[in-house]
């Protein structure tokens, strides 16, 4: 339903930037909203409040009760300020599981990616630029209850990020944007892909996977003075 998605978002308070000019590739395929993710979430919270939606914080759904494949109830674990836990069972006619993936679950990532020919477990070196809380608890629970499994668990939106970034929650500012302006080599000083294969906004999301396939899951982007100032600079000091 992508054709109706943007009008639906506008209806619920999301404000979009005007289309980009001078960059046909991006302007025709992407829509950017004002204020970033925080503004998006705040708009949805305001809209949900007007609709009477109740939002529970520090509440983790860990099991879903089904009856012949149909939703019956969700079991919620409320974490209270004093450290104790209160259980609640919530019944509903329908349920939408918007619980995220398992990109922060090291054990699951290790299982999915396995061991490479060098004896390394690539997933052990991954830096997760998003939240540490996407553990895939409900995803695994539903698979155990017979939900259909589709796709390849190693497929993901994987960008090359600064090796100095924190283990979790570094955000978009950790992305390395100078790849297409120079040469990229692995720790053995070997090039392993065409850096200028296409317009950079169409290629940045493949570089995390490419780096993950290299020794030590690390690579180096080498640029000259002409490239300085032509990309989003790193937020970390040094080179």
Where are these regions (language model features)?
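Conserved redox-cofactor binding core of oxidoreductases
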Residues: 1-88, 92, 105-108, 160-163
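Short glycine-rich loop/turn motifs that provide flexible caps or phosphate-binding loops at active sites
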Residues: 36, 99-100, 181
């Amino acid at each position: 339903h992508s054709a109706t998605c943007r009008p639906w978002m506008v209806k619920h308070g999301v404000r979009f930037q005007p289309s980009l000019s001078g960059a046909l590739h991006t302007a025709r395929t992407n829509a950017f909203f004002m204020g970033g993710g925080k503004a998006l979430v705040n708009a949805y919270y305001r809209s949900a409040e007007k609709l009477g939606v109740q939002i529970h914080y520090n509440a983790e759904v860990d099991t879903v009760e089904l009856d012949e494949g149909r939703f019956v109830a969700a079991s919620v674990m409320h974490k209270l300020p004093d450290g104790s836990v209160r259980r609640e069972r919530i019944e509903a006619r329908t349920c939408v599981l918007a619980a995220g993936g398992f990109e922060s679950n090291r054990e699951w990532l290790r299982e999915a990616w396995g061991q490479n020919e060098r004896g390394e477990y690539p997933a052990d070196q991954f830096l997760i630029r998003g939240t540490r809380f996407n553990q895939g608890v409900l995803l695994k629970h539903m698979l155990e209850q017979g939900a259909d499994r589709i796709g390849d668990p190693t497929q993901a939106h994987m960008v090359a990020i600064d090796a100095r970034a924190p283990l979790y929650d570094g955000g978009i500012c950790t992305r390395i944007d100078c790849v297409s302006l120079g040469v990229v080599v692995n720790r053995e000083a070997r090039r392993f892909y065409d850096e200028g294969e296409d317009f950079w906004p169409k290629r940045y999301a493949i570089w995390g996977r490419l780096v993950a396939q290299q020794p030590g899951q690390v690579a180096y982007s080498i640029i000259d003075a002409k490239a300085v100032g032509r990309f989003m600079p790193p937020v970390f000091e040094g080179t």
